[in-house]
Amino acid sequence: MVAGHFISPSVIFPLSRMANQTAAAKTAITPRRDEDFPEWYQQVVRAAEMAEPSDVRGCMVIRPWGYGVWENMQRQLDAMFKATGHRNAYFPLFIPLSYFEREASHVEGFAKECAIVTHSRLEVNAEGKMVPASPLTEPLVVRPTSETIIGASYAKWVQSYRDLPILINQWANVVRWEMRPRVFLRTTEFLWQEGHTVHETEAEARAETKQMLEVYETFVRDHLAVPVISGEKSESERFPGAVQTLCIEAMVQDRKAIQAGTSHFLGQNFSRASGIQFQSRAGTQEFGWTTSWGMSTRLIGTVIMAHADDDGLVLPPRIAPIHLVILPITTKEETRARVLEAAEKLAGELRALTYFGAPLEVELDQRDLGGGLKNWEWIKKGVPLRVELGPRDLESGTVAVSRRDQPVKTKEFLPVPELVRRAIELLDSIQLNLLERAKQFRDTHTRVIDSKEEFYDFFTPKHSAKPEIHGGFALAHWDGSREVEQQIKDDLKVTIRCIPLEDTANPSEPGVCIFSGGLSRGRVLWGKSY
């Protein structure tokens, strides 16, 4: 039904000479996914040392391992932005309240989430407590998004059509008050990138909106190994002030949707509000056509929920801070020096390799910990490849290699030269396998539905007291009315995730709305979401 939005199945490289061992009954993470998915997610984040809640309600501390993932995502996505002609800049964190008031629908959409600065300093009162002092003449909004403040700069920069297009991206933090925080998925402060562009014509701006959606789709699919469905948001789900919002939607392992990225065609709404005008080729004054688009640290939560298992994190190699960890087994003092020497030699050979345009990241773990403890630490952190090297391996000239996308007790014994030769191939195999596995899961839990009864049954858990994992994505006809959309949201907490983009592989399919009996221009994607 929507196959045209997905890449073809990947080849999964076979592993030879496997030494399969029976998996332990206990798992490293409790509870398991099928027992309590939300708590499982929190435990995976904690066990992998990705992040933790801050003392500031709704905020998080991103720990080095989690930030290493973000750095890789940032570096790779930034290169894709630059390849499409965009440059980076930075704009103020604080936005005058009057700037927001210029665009009424934008203000209304963000009003409940805004943090406001009202005073310029602190002073000690008579009781010896610090209190706000010196009220500001105009309150300042702490950046929830930057269309208005960036628009003020663009209004100064743009005078003529010759100044266009402006193609700028910003890496920044934003603040939106969050009542129900969840690490990476919903936090009051989070990291993101936001692109903001101005164009001479509507056609150019619409092309930019579509192009950046395609950049996001490629990045999430090929770098994060998460398949997505590209589409347009319904009017009620549209970005405040936008004419059109395009999005990519991913399914995670509890069958809920996560909005993985958005690209907005803003028309001339924000250019009129900010005064972005230029002299046209005909000599007349025209308002610019603008776009904005963004992705955030929410993507890290998407990766965790899409790939992690009951033993911890599973990282796609392309964004892993470490690709391969070497675990020397040095239980006997008389062989310790020889084992470490061999491990250091192997690490050097592997570090000389290049993976995905950068040096292969290899960790040689020489900590004075038991081999089992070290092994499980790296399992929980999701390192793609683990290599064990001990005295017996020195004699045989082999090492034990474990892939994180395989059962944790599974090992492949490889001669050292073969490991060096095949390391990149193995990483590519893991990357492709994770994507194919996620795609198969998504497709298995996506259903074409043609009746209201089947729709309600699909999204209703069998056990209301403690709902089991249920539902998924439903492709069903909708008449386009807000009333139907709101009724489904009220009844089932199900929303229209997107109206899938039409292409030659996915022509629109007119039909009848399964809720109202009215005419439908095509099926839309429904689901529960984060």
Placement of each model-derived feature along the sequence:
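Intrinsically disordered, low-complexity segments enriched in small/polar residues
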Residues: 1-2, 281
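Acidic, Ala/Val/Gly-enriched low-complexity intrinsically disordered segments
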Residues: 2-3, 11
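NTP/phosphate- and nucleic-acid-binding module
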Residues: 12-530
